[in-house]
């Protein structure tokens, strides 16, 4: 994989408005799981959430989250498709109130990767394969990220 100005060339780019300037060095990758609606896969609902285009009429659950302004740097779909929403040079809004090793605000110094799925279901081999390539690329670009 190639990264240029914070963008992975092999990723499908969908630019989210939900980001701001990053003022800290990157030293962490945060991996989340997401599905919208919960436990449902294979739609554009996650994209629409990160792009502020989620339609609250499409599912009752969406009425609860319609006002969220969130994003992630990356999404890896069940099929292994890699999407990027925010440049790694910018701060995505993926971690909310958070801390790592006593340092608050993980968004300030981390890259967020979403895997389409849930905490109680298995991920797909294609997702793991893509995740390995992506994390290797990011760790090469940002050497302060350590395996932990």
PLM regions and their residue ranges:
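Active-site-adjacent loop/helix surface patches within enzyme catalytic domains
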Residues: 1-22, 28, 33-144
């Amino acid at each position: 994989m190639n990264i240029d100005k914070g963008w992975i060339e092999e990723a499908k780019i969908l630019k989210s408005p939900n980001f701001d300037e990053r003022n800290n060095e990157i030293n962490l990758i945060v991996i989340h799981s997401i599905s919208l609606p919960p436990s449902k896969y294979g739609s554009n609902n996650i994209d629409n959430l990160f792009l502020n285009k989620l339609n609250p009429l499409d599912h009752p659950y969406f009425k609860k989250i319609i006002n969220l302004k969130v994003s992630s740097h990356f999404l890896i779909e069940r099929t292994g498709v890699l999407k990027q929403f925010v440049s790694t040079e910018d701060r995505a809004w993926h971690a909310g109130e958070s801390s790592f090793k006593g340092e608050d605000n993980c968004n300030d110094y981390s890259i967020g990767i979403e895997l389409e799925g849930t905490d109680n279901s298995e991920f797909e081999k294609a997702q793991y394969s893509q995740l390995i390539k992506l994390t290797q690329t990011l760790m090469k670009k940002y050497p302060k990220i350590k395996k932990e």
